[in-house]
Amino acid sequence: LLKNITEFKELDSAKTTFISTISHELKTPISAIMMSLQLLEDKRVGTLNEEQEQLSKSIKDSSQRLLEITGELLNMTQVEAGKLQMMPKITKPIELIEYAIKANQVQADKFNIQIEVEYPEEKIGKLFVDSEKIAWVLTNLLSNAIRYSRENGRVVIGAQQEGDQIELYVQDFGKGIDPRYHQSIFDRYFRVPGTKVQGSGLGLSISKDFVEAHGGTLTVESELGKGSRFVIRLRA
């Protein structure tokens, strides 16, 4: 039994190393593709016709998704290897919200989704967190909200303070999540049966790991037909 456990740990470690290595190797060529596409968009190599512009946009969207997946895989390997490095600093919640909006604005415009902000600044304190990681979580949650929303709809991102807890939340008004899956959606690689939205099944799992590494919680409130609300709770 001890031998089997040792072999399992070695295999798991090898898997983590392999995924990390492949993800690093993929980032460079994908980034190069993105840079080349940007040159095309800026018309530095000539003007594109309509068909070429559509093709360029399609390649860029796919490349961006690949880049997101490699980022998710790298984050996952850090968590699994116990090498998650935290660099906390004093951060205003609005800075995290603004980062998430900026990162998702193009996607929101694509589907004509209105992003609404709820932020009573005078009533909210500051956080001592790794701003890069919490911003990543909010960005992922907002991206999901947009992708699961109806076209021409709206999503809400905001913050509020309850005692010594600051809540950062993202809400959509899409189809919602079956209560049976409210816990499972935070599992690695889990995908809600029947969903048509593309994804790796890693984003929410990594988000939960990042939040819990700060001593916080990430939860979901959802009702079928009415949408979903994801809430990050952190100590102020």
State what each model feature region is:
Residues 5-45:
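Primarily the dimerization/phosphotransfer
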Residues 53, 87-92, 109, 114-125:
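Conserved catalytic submotifs in the C-terminal HATPase_c
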Residues 61-68:
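Short alpha-helical segment of the dimerization/phosphotransfer core of two-component systems
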Residues 77-88:
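Helix-loop junction within the histidine kinase core
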Residues 93, 176-184:
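Short helix N-cap motif at coil->helix boundaries in the Bergerat
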Residues 203, 207:
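Short alpha-helical Gxxx[C/S/T] motif in the catalytic ATP-binding
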